[in-house]
Amino acid sequence: MFQDNPLLAQLKQQIQENLPKKEGTIKATEKGFGFLEVDSKTSFFIPPAYMKKCMHGDKVIAIIRTENEREVAEPQELVEQMLNRFIGRVKMFKGKLNVVPDHPQLKKMSLKAKTKKGLNPQEFAEGDWVVGHLIRHPLKDDNGFFVEISEKITDADDKIAPWWVTLAENDLPNSEPAGIDDWQIKDDADLERIDMTHIPFVTIDGESTKDMDDALYAKKNDAGDFELTIAIADPTAYITPDDEMDKVARERGFTIYLPGRNIPMLPRDLADELCSLIEGEIRPALCCTVTVSKDGVIGDDIQFFAANIKSHARLAYDNVSDWLETGSCEKWQPSEEIAAIVRDLYEFSQARAEWREKNAVVFPDRPDYRFELSEDNDVVAIHADMRRSANRLVEESMITANICAGKTLQGHFGTGVFNCHAGFKPEKIADVVELVNPEGTLEFTAESIATREGFAALRRWLSKQETTYLDNRIRKFQTYSEVSNQPLPHYAMGLDIYATWTSPIRKYGDMINHRMLKALILNKEPVQKPDDSVGEELALHRKHHKIAERNVADWLYARTLADAPENQTLFTGEIFDINRAGMRIRLLENGAAAFIPGSLIIDNKERIECNGDLGTVSIDKEVVYKLGDVLEVVLADVNQENRSLVAKPTQVFAELPVVEETQN
């Protein structure tokens, strides 16, 4: 009788129009109900029946009404859906395709699905990893949620899943670009390459490195100063800005480095062969010579030039470090000529490091964590590789080279691809001063730390403190590093200018700087200048690559440490973040990040306070942990689904003494 009654529908619409509406984000719970979060302080209950119209993370407009004496939200209009393109796993339900999103809050949702044209649904099995697209949504007047599968990533039990799934999730390629059959050098007709094949350049890399992009030569003169020459591989000899390969390189931005494998920016036949500075092979290179004084000061005689060079020795970090640190190496014994060059390079690097420690900023030594994989992609071991003397030798050479490029590009063009860092966020400077100089007895003022020199002086002071507590707190007040086409300073390094050109096989920005430096050599206009968007593009690429690297590592850590809770394996953790729920630590043995909830420190909410602003954890109002502290922990839980670790301190805090009542 009332079905399809237009008057009833009109009345219902009028009632709804008069009800208050709120816009917010859906927060789902495991119990079927949810909440509309309007802001950090306001939320409304959503009953299970209404939650069927939406999913966690959807941004919606909802009607607020009173039901059973309680304000509830009924989602009415979709502002922005949480899922668009996403990664999921196939679930078969009564023989039909469904997809479960690979997201912690959505793993209980099984969404009906179909394959796109050209994909055979018979080739999909339970648990397979896929790329899905949410094409129907109940709040769009569709009949339920519906997914189209556009790609199968890999089989359910494939051990390559951590890499392929993570790359697909971030929409990143999982292989190098296709090469071409016949690479030709396309130098400007006026570019003269100096024959430097007789100069005994050396390369120093990891044992397994194939894309060797820098070769070094140094000679100490009679005054004790160092004549340094840096030769860098030259892919822009083969790739012009108009080439299709240049577009591919720009789209990729960087070589992607993931635990256990990398995805090159350029084809491997170029990166690992034609451009790689292989021992005994003649290669085109872009070179820089400069004199560095015995006190570590970079001279004004910076010169860039094109050359043909030949590496005279392919050296490995560990072998060179052993030889420098102990005077001998079982695996490697240099000739007199190579020994002299390595010794001069080492002395140069010590002079530069000393100069930077006094005048700029030197980052503290932290290990590089390296996953060793079997052929079946199982983790065999996780190594903590400390940076040794040979690593520092190469690092100082590259920093020197990049300072030279920065000065040259700034002086001649006023533009280039520069790495920059603006120091502290302007609105946080007063907080920094209050933190480090509360009594006003130190040199650090709001005016001084806003300058590059003052910022560097503060960082040097922080590095000399007994604990890293202040350093950890202050990091939250710093800006992020950026890439810019303007010559701006790099506060975090304590340098006036910094422009990288030493890894053009792996970084597109370095290719642009190569073209700029070649224009300087030719005294011509550059064939390519960095446009205003290149910095943002490269920063976005770097962000996605970092996320992918972290996600793969988290997955591998969860796999590798699965038995640690049962075995009660002891680890050493360093606290790097504290919030009101607990603290985050890094396991120093392997680099894994783990969360310690407050309840696993002491299971009494009244006694514990985790203060994110102060970076402290207090029990009974007494600070027991703070940022930078190191503590012994065991893993309480390893969640394979969410790829997360939960840890627990081994330190047990005493119960409060029971106060007995006395009778009068």
Swiss-Prot record:
Residues 193-521 form the RNB domain. GO terms for cellular component: cytosol. It is found in: Cytoplasm. One of its GO terms (biological process) is mRNA catabolic process. One of its GO terms (molecular function) is exoribonuclease II activity. Its main location: cytoplasm. Residues 568-650 form the S1 motif domain. Its EC number is 3.1.13.1. It catalyses: Exonucleolytic cleavage in the 3'- to 5'-direction to yield nucleoside 5'-phosphates. It comes from the Bacteria. InterPro entries: CSD, NA-bd_OB-fold, RNase_B_OB_dom, RNase_II, RNase_II/R, RNase_II/R_CS, RNase_II/RNase_R, RNR_Ribonuclease. PROSITE patterns: RIBONUCLEASE_II (PS01175), S1 (PS50126). Pfam families: OB_RNB, RNB, S1. Keywords: Cytoplasm, Exonuclease, Hydrolase, Nuclease, RNA-binding. The keyword Hydrolase applies. Involved in mRNA degradation. Hydrolyzes single-stranded polyribonucleotides processively in the 3' to 5' direction. NCBIfam families: 3_prime_RNase, PRK05054.1, RNase_B. PANTHER family: EXORIBONUCLEASE 2, RIBONUCLEASE. Belongs to the RNR ribonuclease family. RNase II subfamily. This is Exoribonuclease 2. It comes from Vibrio vulnificus (strain CMCP6).
